């Protein structure tokens, strides 16, 4: 093969029209992602872009909107238990799961119903 896959450039999740402020509250204020500017040509589409380290997450407007309840991104996290407690203190429902050998993990839903996984590999 003459080509190679190098990395995932970004993750895109959908949200309903007009939900940008709610996305900012969840992804920036609660999870700690920084909002990054969308290119001017894409701003009129709505949504918002966020970044944490090398992870870029795009929230795109989709009408009609249907949340991703099964398909999901999985974020590898340091200090997973601290994140879990942080989310619980903010009223976010944490769904425990121990079915991945070698890792601790849990799931949450964003304000729009999209499933998110957070995991930490055990050493």
Labelled PLM ranges:
Residues 42-46, 67-69, 100-104:
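Short acidic/glycine-enriched loop/turn segments that link adjacent beta-strands
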Residues 69-87:
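Mid-chain, well-packed structural core segment of small domains
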Residues 1-6, 90-123:
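Vicinal oxygen chelate
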Residues 58-60, 116-117:
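Conserved beta-strand in the GNAT
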Residues 1-24, 71-73:
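N-terminal beta-strand motif that seeds the catalytic metal site of vicinal oxygen chelate
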Residues 13-56:
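Core segments of cupin and vicinal oxygen chelate
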């Amino acid at each position: 093969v003459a080509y190679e896959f190098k990395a995932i450039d970004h993750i895109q999740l959908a949200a309903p029209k007009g939900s940008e402020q709610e996305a900012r509250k969840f992804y920036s204020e609660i999870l700690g992602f920084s909002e990054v500017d969308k290119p001017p040509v894409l701003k009129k589409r709505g949504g918002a872009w966020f970044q944490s380290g090398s992870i870029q997450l795009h929230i795109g407007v989709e009408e009609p909107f249907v949340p991703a309840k099964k398909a999901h991104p999985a974020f590898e996290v340091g200090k997973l238990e601290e994140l879990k407690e942080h989310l619980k203190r903010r009223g976010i429902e944490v769904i425990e799961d121990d079915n991945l050998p070698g890792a601790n993990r849990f799931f949450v839903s964003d304000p729009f119903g999209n499933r998110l996984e957070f995991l930490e590999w055990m050493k």
